[in-house]
Amino acid sequence: MDPNMMIVKTLSETDCSHDNKLILPRDKVENIVRSTGVPVPRMGIQVEILDNTNSYWVNLRQSQRGYFIGRGWGELRDARNLKAGDVIKLYWQNTKFIFSM
């Protein structure tokens, strides 16, 4: 696994709130964007997150402060019963993120 394609994140209260947004580290996402050549338009891009046997389609977007996963995050968060303090990993492989804890 290429560590440059991995996002490791400790979930915050904001990530687990009803705002349904997962804030991502700007430097990690920009590294993935540079490596893959896949741009993230202002309105976002649909990406798939695989979690064992489940697939979740989410919207990866850019804001003035960085990147976040919006639409679709709440479904994954609730399915995995994620809470603030949990550590998650998103590994970019081909055209999707692979989720792990």
Swiss-Prot record:
The lineage's top-level taxon is: Eukaryota
**A GO molecular function held by the record:** DNA binding
SUPFAM superfamilies per record: DNA-binding pseudobarrel domain
According to its UniProt record, where is this protein located? Nucleus
Cite the Pfam families for this sequence: B3 (PF02362)
- DNA-binding region extent: 7-101
Please state the protein's primary subcellular location. Answer: nucleus
Q: Which InterPro entries match?
A: B3_DNA-bd, B3_domain, DNA-bd_pseudobarrel_sf
Listed A to Z, the keywords are:
DNA-binding, Nucleus, Transcription, Transcription regulation
Keyword Transcription applies: yes
Give a yes or no for keyword Cytoplasm in this entry. Answer: no
Q: What is this protein called?
A: B3 domain-containing protein At1g08985
